[in-house]
């Protein structure tokens, strides 16, 4: 299976996916390209170190969002991937891309959907919401991407009791953090052979 990984930041989840492929936890999978909207994202360096094509496609480089959306989809299509993994990608996915890649784009959201999800809940903002509400159980949700925000069909969820919560990490009773959960969820999905409906 050929995958593209889209990421906006440091790429700790990307690195965990790379490592899982390298050590055989994830099999029959190859990362064709890593795409970031941020030229300074360390994820691009991680990809290069692993011998993976690294590309920056930033909305700021285009005259309009429509022009960005068109080029983003064109470049993604050029890699002929089977699956797109959003690993902390802070860009709204273009509707045409969702249509072309229906049930082939997955996102791992750092909460148990339907809690702390939707517009405004991303990255540390999710953890701020968890902290403010004082919840005792949190986790991560792997879901297909649709036209809504965190509304696609849920594939897997991983939960645990919150024992320490800071704005940098959510440590769960199971010993996992969001950074650990994402590649594990991807690995489980790929290893359990979830079929992609095209």
Predicted features and spans:
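One-carbon transfer enzymes
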Residues: 1-198
């Amino acid at each position: 299976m050929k995958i593209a990984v889209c990421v906006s930041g440091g790429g700790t989840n990307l690195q965990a996916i790379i490592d899982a492929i390298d050590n055989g936890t994830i099999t029959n999978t190859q990362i064709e390209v890593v795409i970031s909207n941020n030229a300074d994202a360390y994820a691009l360096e991680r990809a290069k170190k692993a011998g993976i094509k690294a590309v920056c496609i930033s909305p700021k480089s285009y005259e309009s969002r429509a022009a960005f959306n068109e080029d983003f989809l064109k470049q993604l299509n050029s890699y002929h991937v089977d699956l797109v993994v959003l690993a902390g990608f802070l860009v709204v996915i273009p509707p045409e891309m969702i249509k072309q890649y229906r049930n082939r784009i997955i996102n791992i959201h750092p909460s148990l959907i339907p809690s702390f999800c939707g517009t405004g809940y991303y990255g540390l903002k999710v953890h701020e919401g968890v902290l403010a509400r004082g919840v005792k159980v949190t986790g991560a949700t792997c879901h297909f991407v649709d036209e809504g925000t965190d509304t696609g069909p849920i594939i897997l969820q991983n939960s645990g009791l919150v024992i320490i919560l800071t704005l940098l990490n959510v440590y769960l009773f199971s010993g996992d953090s969001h950074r650990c959960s994402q590649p594990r969820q991807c690995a489980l999905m790929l290893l359990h052979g979830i079929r992609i409906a095209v």
